[in-house]
Amino acid sequence: MAAMEWIILTYDTSSPHKNHLKMVTILAPAKKFMVVITEIFAIIKGVCIGPLDKFPQFPSLSYLKLGHIARRRPMENGGNNMNVLVINAGSSSLKYQLLNPATGALLAKGLCERIGIDGKFTYKPQLEGKEAIKAADVAMPTHNEAIAAVLNALVDEKNGVIGSMKEIDAVGHRVVHGGEKFAKSVVITDEVMAAIEECNPLAPLHNPANITGINACTAVMGKDVPQVAVFDTAFHQTMPDYAYMYGLPYEMYKKYGVRRYGFHGTSHRYVSRRACEILGVPYEDQKIITAHVGNGGSITAIKNGKSVDTSMGLTPVEGLLMGTRCGDVDAGALSFIMDKEGMDGAGLSDLINKRSGVAGLSGISSDMREIEAAVAAGNPRAIMTMNVYNYRIKK
């Protein structure tokens, strides 16, 4: 195994740009290090990674710990040939992809479903001659077993796409809510995990599951593989206060952080950038409206490369009509329902998150394929639901 490297990074934080390299001290012979940060730069307590082109002698810096000292793990599979495992963990599911960012190649993807129940595992290698696994029965009592199943498939002697776990250079995790704490993707440390947990009340259906995925990767892969949190909310941190503040007493914001945060930021950022690439226009000069439409949905206004407004709010419930989420609704209607139904806060959360939206209006399903079939059959509630769904997006 290659020797570990240590380097010290100190940045001139008095600089107005806060990204001027002040000193780099090599404590061991420099080798090739892996990239785990794709943002232009990320500042953590005065220590910064990037912009990488500012110091080409270190083309691929990696794992940064607080305290100005970073331990580096040399790449196992060559300078630009890094592999990143991307994880989107839900409460009972786990989506994954293995990618090579340098080439853009997708090596494999798949899904672990019904974790904690009966376990279904899907694996789709993208290399020629490799066989897929579809909804196989695999015991997954916890996310740890799900991650282990993913890794076993990736390194399988016959149908795997890599030779060993050492060829996975980093893991990227989708984390739904970063609150006001995170405006960029960050390397996961104990401090970062604690901050993510503090945001759990703002995304109780998502953040705990994301944390479970991170912990599962650590348990199965160990702590030497760097992990990065990519936040749904980060892209929207550029919204002005007049776009994100609610008309509630200001104390609610100061005490509890009640404001609009927005979600699907990674999707909106990618789609808007990709649209400009296809159109051949500069991203920083455009006004763009993007739509993320799925079981959850949101609309975002982007000006000069920055999110200036979005349809989701404090939680992913606000905005469009969604699969099981209600979207925009008069807050007074909710207090009215609570009074009439004798409902507590937990009951209300269940109503607006799990029993509303397309499923609640139609009485059929949250699956738009079933709604479309019912519309074709002339079902009046399905037709009404489809009209509401489309109108909310257009509005």
Task: Cite the ranges covered by each PLM segment.
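Short hydrophobic targeting helices and cationic amphipathic motifs
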Residues: 9, 20-21, 27, 56-59, ...
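Short glycine-rich, Thr/Ser-proximal phosphate-binding strand/loop in the N-terminal lobe
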Residues: 93-140, 313
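Short beta-strand-loop/turn "lid" adjacent to the catalytic site in phosphate-handling enzymes
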Residues: 154-206, 226-228, 234-243
